[in-house]
């Protein structure tokens, strides 16, 4: 992840595969670790973070959400976007809130084949490690 207060600094961890279901008959060991730009959309406050606004997405992925997953978007984001005022959709994940609430954002991702042969295997939910947010907050606290 990157945070606004530390532009260009990345907080990284090994990427585990999304938790989900395959649409093909292959072993779970074929799942590639979480990858792609979907996390940008979700950490902004859309995608899985706004799953309660999308009946089809909720129907397909809702059972994969962690406990309290439907509330995660509203809990971890910081402000209602003016264009989404009628929906009261808030955006912008706050690292400090992730740490204080002991929650990580949720990201909806396709599950890809780690051998690159079968392409998309299915879909699922990924949560970045909470330690990334703790590390980011600690680094922010060291700024002058």
Task: For each feature predicted by the language model, list its residue ranges.
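Anaerobic metallocofactor- and corrinoid-dependent redox/one-carbon enzyme cores
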Residues: 1-144
């Amino acid at each position: 992840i990157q945070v606004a207060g530390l532009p260009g600094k990345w907080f990284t961890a090994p990427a585990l595969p999304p938790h989900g279901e395959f649409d093909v008959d292959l072993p779970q060991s074929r799942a590639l670790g979480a990858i792609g730009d979907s996390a940008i959309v979700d950490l902004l406050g859309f995608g899985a973070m706004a799953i309660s606004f999308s009946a089809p997405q909720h129907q397909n992925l809702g059972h994969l959400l962690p406990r309290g997953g439907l509330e995660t978007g509203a809990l971890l984001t910081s402000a209602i976007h003016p264009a989404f005022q009628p929906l009261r959709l808030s955006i912008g994940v706050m690292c400090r809130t992730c740490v204080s609430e002991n929650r990580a954002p949720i990201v909806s991702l396709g599950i890809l084949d780690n051998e690159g042969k079968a392409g998309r295997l299915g879909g699922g939910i990924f949560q970045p490690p909470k330690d990334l947010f703790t590390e980011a907050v600690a680094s922010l606290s060291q700024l002058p």
